[in-house]
Amino acid sequence: MKMSEVPRIKVFRPTWEEFKDFPKYVAYMESQGAHKAGLAKVVPPPEWVPRRSGYADLDALNVTIPAPICQVVTGKQGYYQQINIQKKPLTVKQFSELASTERYATPKHFDFEDLERKYWKNITYVAPIYGADVSGSITDTDQDSWNINRLGTILDYVNKDYNIQIDGVNTAYLYFGMWKTTFAWHTEDMDLYSINYLHFGAPKTWYVVPPECGRKLEKVANQYFPASYKNCNAYLRHKMTLISPQILKQHDVPVSKITQEAGEIMITFPFGYHAGFNHGFNCAESTNFAMERWIEYGKRAVQCTCSNDMVKISMDTFVKRFQSDRYDLWMEGRDVGRHPEDPPNAVLSAAPLPPHLDVLLCDKKMKKQCNPTKAKSFKERNPDLDLDEIQQNPNVPDDVKAMLKESVLTLDTGDLATDEADFPNEDAMSLQSPANLKTKQELLEYIDDGTEDDDEEEDFKRRKQKRRYDADYDDDWLASKRKTNSRNNRGRSPRTKDDRSISPASSTSSTSRGARRGKASGTPRKTPARRKKDSITTSPAVSSAATAVKTPTSAVVAGTTSIATTTTPPADGGGGESSSLGSHCTTASP
Protein backbone atom coordinates (compact mmCIF):
# COMPACT_ATOMS: atom_id res chain seq x y z
CA MET A 1 0.00 0.00 0.00
CA LYS A 2 1.37 3.41 -1.00
CA MET A 3 1.60 6.01 1.75
CA SER A 4 -0.84 8.19 -0.19
CA GLU A 5 -3.35 5.34 -0.01
CA VAL A 6 -3.10 4.76 3.75
CA PRO A 7 -6.54 5.37 5.32
CA ARG A 8 -6.52 8.41 7.58
CA ILE A 9 -7.59 8.29 11.21
CA LYS A 10 -10.84 10.22 11.29
CA VAL A 11 -11.96 12.53 14.08
CA PHE A 12 -15.71 12.90 14.63
CA ARG A 13 -17.44 15.76 16.44
CA PRO A 14 -21.10 14.74 16.80
CA THR A 15 -23.89 16.99 17.98
CA TRP A 16 -25.79 15.98 21.10
CA GLU A 17 -28.63 14.54 19.03
CA GLU A 18 -26.25 12.53 16.85
CA PHE A 19 -24.34 11.33 19.89
CA LYS A 20 -27.23 9.91 21.91
CA ASP A 21 -27.58 6.58 20.08
CA PHE A 22 -24.25 4.73 20.35
CA PRO A 23 -24.79 1.84 17.86
CA LYS A 24 -26.35 4.20 15.33
CA TYR A 25 -23.44 6.62 15.50
CA VAL A 26 -20.83 3.86 15.16
CA ALA A 27 -22.69 2.69 12.06
CA TYR A 28 -22.52 6.26 10.73
CA MET A 29 -18.77 6.38 11.43
CA GLU A 30 -18.30 3.23 9.37
CA SER A 31 -20.42 4.68 6.56
CA GLN A 32 -17.78 7.43 6.42
CA GLY A 33 -14.98 4.86 6.17
CA ALA A 34 -13.66 5.23 9.73
CA HIS A 35 -13.07 1.49 10.08
CA LYS A 36 -10.58 1.43 7.21
CA ALA A 37 -7.90 3.03 9.39
CA GLY A 38 -8.61 0.63 12.27
CA LEU A 39 -8.99 3.51 14.74
CA ALA A 40 -11.08 6.68 15.08
CA LYS A 41 -11.46 9.49 17.57
CA VAL A 42 -14.74 10.91 18.84
CA VAL A 43 -14.88 14.30 20.56
CA PRO A 44 -18.09 14.20 22.63
CA PRO A 45 -20.48 17.16 22.63
CA PRO A 46 -20.25 19.46 25.67
CA GLU A 47 -23.69 18.30 26.86
CA TRP A 48 -22.27 14.85 27.63
CA VAL A 49 -20.94 14.69 31.20
CA PRO A 50 -19.91 11.15 32.20
CA ARG A 51 -19.18 12.07 35.84
CA ARG A 52 -20.94 15.09 37.30
CA SER A 53 -18.83 15.18 40.48
CA GLY A 54 -15.61 15.44 38.49
CA TYR A 55 -12.21 14.01 39.37
CA ALA A 56 -10.62 16.48 41.79
CA ASP A 57 -11.00 14.14 44.77
CA LEU A 58 -9.25 10.89 43.85
CA ASP A 59 -10.32 9.22 47.10
CA ALA A 60 -13.94 9.86 46.10
CA LEU A 61 -13.49 7.52 43.14
CA ASN A 62 -13.68 4.71 45.70
CA VAL A 63 -11.40 2.50 43.62
CA THR A 64 -8.45 0.38 44.66
CA ILE A 65 -5.93 -0.90 42.14
CA PRO A 66 -5.68 -4.49 43.43
CA ALA A 67 -2.70 -5.64 41.37
CA PRO A 68 -0.64 -2.90 39.70
CA ILE A 69 1.83 -4.28 37.19
CA CYS A 70 5.51 -3.48 36.78
CA GLN A 71 6.23 -3.45 33.04
CA VAL A 72 9.69 -4.91 32.41
CA VAL A 73 10.92 -4.45 28.82
CA THR A 74 13.66 -6.47 27.16
CA GLY A 75 15.06 -6.25 23.65
CA LYS A 76 16.86 -3.79 21.42
CA GLN A 77 16.99 -1.98 18.09
CA GLY A 78 13.29 -1.62 17.48
CA TYR A 79 11.74 -4.89 18.63
CA TYR A 80 10.97 -5.64 22.26
CA GLN A 81 9.00 -7.88 24.55
CA GLN A 82 7.50 -6.99 27.89
CA ILE A 83 6.63 -8.87 31.06
CA ASN A 84 4.06 -7.50 33.48
CA ILE A 85 4.82 -8.37 37.11
CA GLN A 86 2.04 -7.93 39.65
CA LYS A 87 2.76 -5.62 42.57
CA LYS A 88 1.03 -4.73 45.83
CA PRO A 89 -2.36 -2.96 45.94
CA LEU A 90 -2.54 0.83 45.77
CA THR A 91 -5.29 3.40 46.11
CA VAL A 92 -5.70 5.74 43.16
CA LYS A 93 -4.35 8.58 45.31
CA GLN A 94 -1.25 6.55 46.14
CA PHE A 95 -0.80 5.64 42.49
CA SER A 96 -0.96 9.31 41.49
CA GLU A 97 1.68 10.15 44.11
CA LEU A 98 3.87 7.33 42.82
CA ALA A 99 3.50 8.62 39.25
CA SER A 100 4.71 12.05 40.37
CA THR A 101 7.92 10.82 42.02
CA GLU A 102 11.17 11.69 40.31
CA ARG A 103 11.67 8.10 39.21
CA TYR A 104 8.35 7.78 37.37
CA ALA A 105 7.46 11.37 36.44
CA THR A 106 7.06 12.48 32.83
CA PRO A 107 10.32 14.03 31.57
CA LYS A 108 10.43 17.62 30.39
CA HIS A 109 9.59 17.88 26.72
CA PHE A 110 8.83 20.47 24.06
CA ASP A 111 5.86 18.76 22.42
CA PHE A 112 4.31 15.35 21.76
CA GLU A 113 6.93 14.52 19.13
CA ASP A 114 9.73 15.20 21.60
CA LEU A 115 8.05 13.06 24.26
CA GLU A 116 7.55 10.25 21.74
CA ARG A 117 11.27 10.29 20.99
CA LYS A 118 12.06 10.09 24.70
CA TYR A 119 9.66 7.15 25.04
CA TRP A 120 11.44 5.05 22.42
CA LYS A 121 14.88 6.10 23.64
CA ASN A 122 14.09 5.04 27.21
CA ILE A 123 11.97 1.97 26.57
CA THR A 124 14.17 -0.38 28.63
CA TYR A 125 14.93 2.09 31.41
CA VAL A 126 12.93 2.29 34.69
CA ALA A 127 10.06 -0.20 34.53
CA PRO A 128 6.86 1.84 35.03
CA ILE A 129 3.85 0.76 37.10
CA TYR A 130 0.51 0.37 35.31
CA GLY A 131 -2.83 0.23 37.12
CA ALA A 132 -4.35 -1.90 34.38
CA ASP A 133 -7.42 -4.13 34.17
CA VAL A 134 -9.22 -2.72 37.23
CA SER A 135 -12.76 -4.05 36.99
CA GLY A 136 -15.31 -1.28 37.45
CA SER A 137 -16.55 2.05 36.14
CA ILE A 138 -16.42 5.66 37.35
CA THR A 139 -19.12 6.81 34.92
CA ASP A 140 -22.36 7.91 36.57
CA THR A 141 -24.79 5.00 36.59
CA ASP A 142 -27.64 7.21 35.34
CA GLN A 143 -25.68 8.34 32.28
CA ASP A 144 -27.62 6.66 29.49
CA SER A 145 -25.58 7.85 26.50
CA TRP A 146 -22.27 6.15 25.70
CA ASN A 147 -22.13 4.54 29.13
CA ILE A 148 -19.23 2.13 28.71
CA ASN A 149 -20.85 -0.35 31.09
CA ARG A 150 -23.95 -0.63 28.89
CA LEU A 151 -23.44 0.38 25.28
CA GLY A 152 -26.42 -1.56 23.94
CA THR A 153 -24.73 -3.48 21.12
CA ILE A 154 -25.16 -7.08 19.96
CA LEU A 155 -22.38 -8.21 22.32
CA ASP A 156 -25.04 -7.96 25.05
CA TYR A 157 -26.41 -11.29 23.80
CA VAL A 158 -23.51 -13.06 25.51
CA ASN A 159 -24.96 -12.00 28.85
CA LYS A 160 -28.62 -12.27 27.82
CA ASP A 161 -28.37 -15.76 26.32
CA TYR A 162 -25.69 -17.32 28.52
CA ASN A 163 -25.85 -15.14 31.66
CA ILE A 164 -22.10 -14.60 31.33
CA GLN A 165 -20.10 -11.49 32.11
CA ILE A 166 -16.52 -11.27 30.89
CA ASP A 167 -14.47 -8.72 32.81
CA GLY A 168 -13.24 -6.02 30.45
CA VAL A 169 -15.03 -7.53 27.45
CA ASN A 170 -18.72 -6.97 28.15
CA THR A 171 -18.07 -5.06 31.39
CA ALA A 172 -15.93 -1.98 31.95
CA TYR A 173 -12.25 -1.93 32.92
CA LEU A 174 -10.35 1.04 34.34
CA TYR A 175 -6.73 1.80 33.44
CA PHE A 176 -4.58 4.09 35.58
CA GLY A 177 -1.48 5.03 33.63
CA MET A 178 1.78 6.82 34.30
CA TRP A 179 4.61 7.92 32.04
CA LYS A 180 5.79 5.19 29.68
CA THR A 181 3.17 2.56 30.57
CA THR A 182 2.55 0.63 27.39
CA PHE A 183 -0.02 -1.45 25.55
CA ALA A 184 1.54 -3.75 22.96
CA TRP A 185 0.58 -4.56 19.39
CA HIS A 186 -2.66 -6.54 19.46
CA THR A 187 -6.16 -6.81 18.15
CA GLU A 188 -9.02 -7.13 20.61
CA ASP A 189 -10.13 -10.51 21.94
CA MET A 190 -12.09 -12.28 19.21
CA ASP A 191 -11.19 -9.29 16.96
CA LEU A 192 -13.98 -7.26 18.58
CA TYR A 193 -14.47 -3.50 18.54
CA SER A 194 -13.34 -1.51 21.57
CA ILE A 195 -14.04 1.87 23.12
CA ASN A 196 -11.63 3.83 25.32
CA TYR A 197 -12.61 7.03 27.14
CA LEU A 198 -9.88 9.10 28.79
CA HIS A 199 -11.57 10.44 31.93
CA PHE A 200 -8.74 12.68 33.09
CA GLY A 201 -5.00 13.21 33.13
CA ALA A 202 -2.15 13.09 30.67
CA PRO A 203 -2.63 12.16 26.99
CA LYS A 204 -2.26 8.73 25.43
CA THR A 205 -0.48 8.11 22.12
CA TRP A 206 -1.95 5.47 19.80
CA TYR A 207 -0.37 3.66 16.84
CA VAL A 208 -2.56 1.70 14.43
CA VAL A 209 -2.17 -0.46 11.33
CA PRO A 210 -5.13 -0.56 8.90
CA PRO A 211 -7.03 -3.87 9.18
CA GLU A 212 -6.27 -4.72 5.55
CA CYS A 213 -2.55 -4.61 6.45
CA GLY A 214 -2.88 -6.66 9.63
CA ARG A 215 -1.51 -9.81 8.00
CA LYS A 216 1.57 -7.87 6.88
CA LEU A 217 2.25 -6.80 10.46
CA GLU A 218 1.91 -10.41 11.59
CA LYS A 219 4.45 -11.54 8.98
CA VAL A 220 6.95 -8.92 10.14
CA ALA A 221 6.45 -9.89 13.78
CA ASN A 222 6.94 -13.55 12.88
CA GLN A 223 10.31 -12.70 11.31
CA TYR A 224 11.53 -11.09 14.52
CA PHE A 225 9.96 -13.63 16.88
CA PRO A 226 10.05 -16.95 14.95
CA ALA A 227 10.16 -19.21 18.00
CA SER A 228 7.10 -17.52 19.51
CA TYR A 229 5.20 -17.98 16.25
CA LYS A 230 6.19 -21.63 16.05
CA ASN A 231 5.02 -22.14 19.61
CA CYS A 232 1.68 -20.28 19.22
CA ASN A 233 0.44 -18.80 15.96
CA ALA A 234 -1.61 -16.27 17.95
CA TYR A 235 1.24 -15.15 20.23
CA LEU A 236 0.44 -11.48 19.57
CA ARG A 237 -2.64 -12.08 21.73
CA HIS A 238 -0.21 -12.44 24.64
CA LYS A 239 0.10 -8.64 24.44
CA MET A 240 3.83 -8.58 25.07
CA THR A 241 5.32 -7.61 21.70
CA LEU A 242 5.96 -4.09 20.45
CA ILE A 243 7.78 -3.28 17.22
CA SER A 244 8.71 0.32 16.52
CA PRO A 245 6.92 2.17 13.70
CA GLN A 246 10.34 2.67 12.12
CA ILE A 247 10.84 -1.09 11.77
CA LEU A 248 7.33 -1.58 10.40
CA LYS A 249 7.86 1.21 7.89
CA GLN A 250 11.04 -0.47 6.67
CA HIS A 251 8.89 -3.53 5.91
CA ASP A 252 6.21 -1.48 4.11
CA VAL A 253 3.67 -1.81 6.91
CA PRO A 254 1.78 1.51 7.16
CA VAL A 255 1.42 2.89 10.68
CA SER A 256 -0.63 5.93 11.66
CA LYS A 257 -0.62 7.67 15.01
CA ILE A 258 -2.85 10.00 16.97
CA THR A 259 -2.86 11.45 20.46
CA GLN A 260 -5.90 11.07 22.69
CA GLU A 261 -6.43 13.79 25.29
CA ALA A 262 -8.65 13.93 28.36
CA GLY A 263 -12.34 13.96 27.48
CA GLU A 264 -11.84 12.20 24.14
CA ILE A 265 -12.97 8.76 23.00
CA MET A 266 -11.10 6.27 20.84
CA ILE A 267 -12.85 3.50 18.89
CA THR A 268 -10.89 0.53 17.54
CA PHE A 269 -12.35 -1.60 14.78
CA PRO A 270 -12.19 -5.36 14.12
CA PHE A 271 -8.70 -6.63 13.29
CA GLY A 272 -7.17 -3.18 13.71
CA TYR A 273 -3.76 -3.82 15.27
CA HIS A 274 -2.96 -1.04 17.72
CA ALA A 275 -0.38 -0.15 20.37
CA GLY A 276 0.62 2.91 22.36
CA PHE A 277 1.75 4.51 25.59
CA ASN A 278 0.66 6.98 28.27
CA HIS A 279 2.25 10.41 28.67
CA GLY A 280 1.76 10.52 32.43
CA PHE A 281 -0.78 9.92 35.20
CA ASN A 282 -4.24 9.42 33.74
CA CYS A 283 -7.38 7.31 33.96
CA ALA A 284 -9.16 5.62 31.06
CA GLU A 285 -12.26 3.44 30.95
CA SER A 286 -12.63 0.77 28.30
CA THR A 287 -14.60 -2.24 27.12
CA ASN A 288 -15.41 -4.21 23.97
CA PHE A 289 -18.54 -4.13 21.87
CA ALA A 290 -19.81 -5.65 18.64
CA MET A 291 -21.70 -4.67 15.53
CA GLU A 292 -23.22 -7.06 13.01
CA ARG A 293 -20.24 -6.52 10.69
CA TRP A 294 -18.00 -8.13 13.33
CA ILE A 295 -19.61 -11.59 13.22
CA GLU A 296 -17.54 -12.88 10.31
CA TYR A 297 -14.38 -11.63 12.06
CA GLY A 298 -15.37 -13.41 15.26
CA LYS A 299 -16.09 -16.69 13.49
CA ARG A 300 -12.62 -16.74 11.95
CA ALA A 301 -10.54 -15.09 14.68
CA VAL A 302 -7.27 -16.93 15.36
CA GLN A 303 -7.10 -18.16 18.95
CA CYS A 304 -4.18 -18.60 21.32
CA THR A 305 -3.50 -22.29 21.93
CA CYS A 306 -0.97 -22.10 24.76
CA SER A 307 -3.02 -20.63 27.59
CA ASN A 308 -6.30 -21.49 29.27
CA ASP A 309 -6.90 -17.86 30.19
CA MET A 310 -7.50 -16.38 26.75
CA VAL A 311 -11.00 -15.04 26.05
CA LYS A 312 -13.08 -17.10 23.65
CA ILE A 313 -16.68 -16.21 22.90
CA SER A 314 -19.22 -18.65 21.53
CA MET A 315 -20.36 -17.45 18.13
CA ASP A 316 -23.44 -19.69 18.22
CA THR A 317 -25.86 -16.99 19.36
CA PHE A 318 -24.61 -14.51 16.75
CA VAL A 319 -24.69 -16.91 13.79
CA LYS A 320 -28.13 -18.16 14.82
CA ARG A 321 -29.55 -14.63 15.14
CA PHE A 322 -27.85 -12.78 12.28
CA GLN A 323 -26.76 -15.49 9.80
CA SER A 324 -29.63 -17.93 10.18
CA ASP A 325 -29.39 -18.96 6.52
CA ARG A 326 -25.81 -20.16 7.13
CA TYR A 327 -26.26 -21.62 10.60
CA ASP A 328 -26.71 -25.23 9.49
CA LEU A 329 -23.74 -25.01 7.12
CA TRP A 330 -21.63 -23.57 9.92
CA MET A 331 -22.64 -26.32 12.35
CA GLU A 332 -21.78 -28.93 9.69
CA GLY A 333 -18.34 -27.41 9.06
CA ARG A 334 -19.25 -26.34 5.53
CA ASP A 335 -19.36 -22.54 5.98
CA VAL A 336 -16.52 -21.95 3.53
CA GLY A 337 -14.96 -18.51 3.14
CA ARG A 338 -12.06 -16.36 4.29
CA HIS A 339 -11.30 -13.89 7.05
CA PRO A 340 -12.67 -10.47 5.98
CA GLU A 341 -9.16 -8.98 5.94
CA ASP A 342 -7.40 -11.84 4.16
CA PRO A 343 -6.17 -11.04 0.64
CA PRO A 344 -8.36 -12.15 -2.29
CA ASN A 345 -5.95 -14.96 -3.17
CA ALA A 346 -6.10 -16.45 0.34
CA VAL A 347 -7.07 -20.10 0.59
CA LEU A 348 -10.75 -20.62 1.36
CA SER A 349 -11.55 -22.59 4.49
CA ALA A 350 -14.50 -23.51 6.65
CA ALA A 351 -15.20 -21.37 9.69
CA PRO A 352 -14.22 -23.23 12.88
CA LEU A 353 -16.97 -25.11 14.65
CA PRO A 354 -18.00 -24.06 18.16
CA PRO A 355 -16.34 -26.22 20.86
CA HIS A 356 -18.68 -28.52 22.78
CA LEU A 357 -18.55 -26.44 25.97
CA ASP A 358 -18.07 -23.09 24.27
CA VAL A 359 -21.07 -21.49 25.94
CA LEU A 360 -19.37 -21.93 29.31
CA LEU A 361 -16.25 -20.17 28.10
CA CYS A 362 -16.18 -17.43 30.71
CA ASP A 363 -16.81 -19.42 33.84
CA LYS A 364 -13.38 -19.44 35.49
CA LYS A 365 -13.97 -22.94 36.83
CA MET A 366 -14.72 -24.22 33.33
CA LYS A 367 -11.99 -22.43 31.36
CA LYS A 368 -9.67 -25.41 31.24
CA GLN A 369 -12.46 -27.65 29.96
CA CYS A 370 -13.57 -25.08 27.39
CA ASN A 371 -10.07 -24.24 26.17
CA PRO A 372 -8.00 -27.38 26.66
CA THR A 373 -4.32 -26.69 26.05
CA LYS A 374 -1.11 -28.56 26.53
CA ALA A 375 0.62 -27.54 29.74
CA LYS A 376 3.70 -25.44 29.02
CA SER A 377 6.12 -23.54 31.18
CA PHE A 378 6.40 -19.78 30.90
CA LYS A 379 9.69 -20.13 29.02
CA GLU A 380 8.11 -22.63 26.62
CA ARG A 381 5.23 -20.28 25.91
CA ASN A 382 7.59 -17.35 25.31
CA PRO A 383 10.70 -18.83 23.68
CA ASP A 384 11.89 -15.53 22.18
CA LEU A 385 11.96 -13.83 25.58
CA ASP A 386 15.52 -13.48 26.89
CA LEU A 387 15.10 -14.07 30.63
CA ASP A 388 18.86 -14.00 31.16
CA GLU A 389 18.93 -10.51 29.73
CA ILE A 390 16.33 -9.43 32.26
CA GLN A 391 18.44 -10.85 35.08
CA GLN A 392 21.46 -8.90 33.80
CA ASN A 393 19.61 -5.65 33.12
CA PRO A 394 20.65 -3.13 35.82
CA ASN A 395 17.40 -1.22 35.30
CA VAL A 396 15.15 -4.08 36.44
CA PRO A 397 14.27 -3.92 40.16
CA ASP A 398 15.83 -6.65 42.30
CA ASP A 399 12.47 -7.85 43.63
CA VAL A 400 11.24 -8.37 40.05
CA LYS A 401 14.35 -10.36 39.19
CA ALA A 402 13.92 -12.49 42.29
CA MET A 403 10.27 -13.16 41.49
CA LEU A 404 11.11 -14.21 37.94
CA LYS A 405 13.95 -16.43 39.10
CA GLU A 406 11.90 -18.17 41.77
CA SER A 407 8.61 -18.48 39.92
CA VAL A 408 9.69 -18.89 36.30
CA LEU A 409 13.16 -20.28 36.00
CA THR A 410 12.30 -23.24 38.24
CA LEU A 411 9.61 -24.48 35.83
CA ASP A 412 12.02 -25.82 33.20
CA THR A 413 11.65 -29.51 33.98
CA GLY A 414 7.98 -29.69 34.83
CA ASP A 415 4.60 -28.73 33.52
CA LEU A 416 3.29 -25.22 33.77
CA ALA A 417 2.43 -24.52 37.39
CA THR A 418 -1.32 -24.34 37.02
CA ASP A 419 -2.03 -25.21 40.63
CA GLU A 420 -3.34 -22.26 42.59
CA ALA A 421 -0.72 -22.79 45.29
CA ASP A 422 2.20 -22.29 42.92
CA PHE A 423 1.56 -18.57 42.58
CA PRO A 424 -0.10 -15.88 44.69
CA ASN A 425 -3.85 -16.06 44.26
CA GLU A 426 -5.09 -13.13 42.19
CA ASP A 427 -8.42 -12.94 43.97
CA ALA A 428 -6.65 -12.98 47.32
CA MET A 429 -4.38 -10.18 46.13
CA SER A 430 -7.39 -8.11 45.14
CA LEU A 431 -8.74 -8.35 48.70
CA GLN A 432 -5.60 -6.93 50.25
CA SER A 433 -5.87 -3.36 51.52
CA PRO A 434 -3.29 -0.81 50.42
CA ALA A 435 -0.84 0.21 53.12
CA ASN A 436 -1.16 3.52 54.96
CA LEU A 437 1.86 5.42 53.59
CA LYS A 438 2.86 8.96 54.56
CA THR A 439 5.88 9.80 52.40
CA LYS A 440 6.97 9.23 48.83
CA GLN A 441 9.96 7.34 50.18
CA GLU A 442 7.63 4.89 51.97
CA LEU A 443 5.57 4.57 48.80
CA LEU A 444 8.62 3.71 46.70
CA GLU A 445 9.86 1.17 49.24
CA TYR A 446 6.37 -0.36 49.44
CA ILE A 447 6.06 -0.82 45.68
CA ASP A 448 9.62 -2.22 45.55
CA ASP A 449 8.98 -4.69 48.38
CA GLY A 450 11.58 -2.88 50.46
CA THR A 451 14.54 -3.61 48.16
CA GLU A 452 16.96 -0.72 47.92
CA ASP A 453 20.60 -0.05 47.18
CA ASP A 454 22.24 2.72 49.21
CA ASP A 455 24.50 3.61 46.28
CA GLU A 456 21.61 4.15 43.86
CA GLU A 457 20.93 7.76 44.89
CA GLU A 458 24.39 8.88 43.81
CA ASP A 459 24.15 6.86 40.60
CA PHE A 460 20.79 8.36 39.69
CA LYS A 461 21.99 11.93 40.31
CA ARG A 462 25.05 11.33 38.14
CA ARG A 463 22.96 10.09 35.22
CA LYS A 464 20.36 12.81 35.70
CA GLN A 465 23.10 15.43 35.41
CA LYS A 466 24.10 13.92 32.06
CA ARG A 467 20.58 14.33 30.77
CA ARG A 468 20.80 18.08 31.24
CA TYR A 469 23.41 18.52 28.55
CA ASP A 470 23.01 15.30 26.55
CA ALA A 471 19.80 15.62 24.55
CA ASP A 472 20.31 12.27 22.82
CA TYR A 473 20.79 10.25 26.00
CA ASP A 474 19.85 6.70 25.12
CA ASP A 475 18.87 4.20 27.81
CA ASP A 476 18.52 1.25 25.46
CA TRP A 477 21.16 -0.42 27.59
CA LEU A 478 21.85 -3.38 25.30
CA ALA A 479 21.77 -1.57 21.97
CA SER A 480 24.92 -2.45 20.10
CA LYS A 481 24.69 0.33 17.54
CA ARG A 482 24.32 4.05 18.12
CA LYS A 483 23.58 6.75 15.62
CA THR A 484 26.02 9.58 15.07
CA ASN A 485 24.99 12.73 16.88
CA SER A 486 25.15 15.08 13.93
CA ARG A 487 24.33 18.06 16.08
CA ASN A 488 27.43 17.54 18.21
CA ASN A 489 29.60 17.04 15.13
CA ARG A 490 28.11 19.91 13.15
CA GLY A 491 30.71 22.54 12.36
CA ARG A 492 33.67 20.42 13.43
CA SER A 493 36.65 19.71 11.23
CA PRO A 494 36.65 16.19 9.81
CA ARG A 495 38.75 13.74 11.77
CA THR A 496 41.87 12.39 10.18
CA LYS A 497 42.69 8.73 10.18
CA ASP A 498 45.25 9.40 12.89
CA ASP A 499 42.65 11.17 15.03
CA ARG A 500 40.29 8.22 14.76
CA SER A 501 42.99 5.77 15.70
CA ILE A 502 43.81 7.79 18.79
CA SER A 503 40.22 8.18 20.00
CA PRO A 504 37.92 5.56 18.46
CA ALA A 505 35.33 5.98 21.23
CA SER A 506 34.70 9.56 20.21
CA SER A 507 33.74 8.76 16.62
CA THR A 508 30.10 8.92 17.65
CA SER A 509 28.57 10.80 20.51
CA SER A 510 26.51 7.82 21.63
CA THR A 511 29.59 5.62 21.89
CA SER A 512 31.33 8.12 24.09
CA ARG A 513 28.20 8.33 26.22
CA GLY A 514 28.30 4.56 26.57
CA ALA A 515 31.89 4.75 27.71
CA ARG A 516 31.02 7.42 30.26
CA ARG A 517 28.29 5.15 31.60
CA GLY A 518 30.72 2.27 31.97
CA LYS A 519 29.53 0.34 28.94
CA ALA A 520 33.02 0.08 27.47
CA SER A 521 34.29 -1.72 30.54
CA GLY A 522 31.13 -3.78 30.91
CA THR A 523 30.25 -2.12 34.22
CA PRO A 524 26.46 -2.27 34.65
CA ARG A 525 24.51 0.76 35.74
CA LYS A 526 22.43 0.48 38.85
CA THR A 527 18.72 0.86 39.28
CA PRO A 528 17.62 4.46 40.00
CA ALA A 529 17.47 5.29 43.66
CA ARG A 530 14.61 6.19 45.92
CA ARG A 531 14.07 9.89 46.14
CA LYS A 532 14.17 12.22 49.10
CA LYS A 533 11.37 11.94 51.59
CA ASP A 534 8.75 14.39 50.42
CA SER A 535 5.64 14.50 52.55
CA ILE A 536 2.42 13.36 50.98
CA THR A 537 -1.10 13.19 52.23
CA THR A 538 -1.95 9.95 53.96
CA SER A 539 -4.14 7.79 51.76
CA PRO A 540 -6.37 5.49 53.80
CA ALA A 541 -7.37 2.13 52.42
CA VAL A 542 -10.30 2.46 50.09
CA SER A 543 -12.78 -0.33 49.49
CA SER A 544 -12.71 -1.35 45.86
CA ALA A 545 -15.65 -0.59 43.64
CA ALA A 546 -14.42 -3.50 41.58
CA THR A 547 -13.59 -7.02 42.44
CA ALA A 548 -10.88 -7.69 39.78
CA VAL A 549 -8.43 -5.79 38.11
CA LYS A 550 0.00 17.73 15.89
CA THR A 551 -0.12 19.08 12.99
CA PRO A 552 -2.94 17.27 11.32
CA THR A 553 -4.52 18.10 8.01
CA SER A 554 -8.25 18.45 8.53
CA ALA A 555 -11.13 18.06 6.14
CA VAL A 556 -14.80 18.40 7.04
CA VAL A 557 -17.13 15.71 5.70
CA ALA A 558 -20.82 15.81 6.57
CA GLY A 559 -20.28 17.40 9.93
CA THR A 560 -17.32 15.12 10.62
CA THR A 561 -13.71 16.22 10.79
CA SER A 562 -11.24 13.84 9.18
CA ILE A 563 -7.69 14.01 10.49
CA ALA A 564 -4.65 12.73 8.65
CA THR A 565 -2.08 11.32 11.00
CA THR A 566 0.32 9.18 9.02
CA THR A 567 3.19 8.39 11.30
CA THR A 568 6.52 10.12 11.22
CA PRO A 569 8.29 7.25 12.95
CA PRO A 570 10.57 7.90 15.91
CA ALA A 571 14.29 7.55 15.48
CA ASP A 572 14.68 4.13 17.03
CA GLY A 573 13.24 1.72 19.53
CA GLY A 574 10.31 -0.46 20.40
CA GLY A 575 8.57 -2.04 23.33
CA GLY A 576 6.18 -4.77 24.38
CA GLU A 577 3.46 -6.05 26.67
CA SER A 578 3.21 -9.18 28.71
CA SER A 579 1.71 -12.64 28.72
CA SER A 580 0.67 -14.43 31.86
CA LEU A 581 3.00 -15.93 34.43
CA GLY A 582 0.60 -17.62 36.78
CA SER A 583 -0.80 -14.78 38.86
CA HIS A 584 2.45 -12.84 38.82
CA CYS A 585 2.16 -11.77 35.21
CA THR A 586 -0.86 -10.44 33.42
CA THR A 587 -1.81 -8.73 30.20
CA ALA A 588 -2.58 -5.07 29.78
CA SER A 589 -4.62 -2.99 27.37
CA PRO A 590 -5.08 0.74 26.93
Swiss-Prot record:
Biological process per Gene Ontology, one example term: chromatin remodeling
For this chain, the family text in UniProt reads: Belongs to the JHDM3 histone demethylase family.
Q: Basic residues compositional bias: what residue ranges?
A: 480-494
Query: Which superkingdom heads the taxonomic lineage of this protein's source?
Result: Eukaryota
What name does the UniProt record give this protein?
Probable lysine-specific demethylase 4B
Q: What does this protein do?
A: Probable histone demethylase that specifically demethylates 'Lys-9' and 'Lys-36' residues of histone H3, thereby playing a central role in histone code. Demethylation of Lys residue generates formaldehyde and succinate.
What cofactors does this protein use? Fe(2+)
What are the entry keywords? Chromatin regulator, Dioxygenase, Iron, Metal-binding, Nucleus, Oxidoreductase, Transcription, Transcription regulation, Zinc
SMART domains of this UniProt entry? JmjC, JmjN
Bias regions of kind Acidic residues — which residues?
A: 445-458
Q: Which GO terms describe its molecular function?
A: histone H3K36 demethylase activity; histone H3K36me2/H3K36me3 demethylase activity; histone H3K9 demethylase activity; histone H3K9me2/H3K9me3 demethylase activity; metal ion binding
Locations listed in the record: Nucleus
Q: Where does Zn(2+) bind?
A: C232, H238, C304, C306
Outline the segment boundaries, as ranges, of region: Disordered: 372-395, 417-590
Q: Domain named JmjN: which ranges? A: 9-51
Location (main, coarse): nucleus
Note on how the cofactor is bound: Binds 1 Fe(2+) ion per subunit.
Q: What is its EC number?
A: 1.14.11.66
Annotated binding of 2-oxoglutarate, by residue: Y130, N196, K204, K239
Domain (JmjC) spans 140-306
Q: Which InterPro entries match?
A: JmjC_dom, JmjN
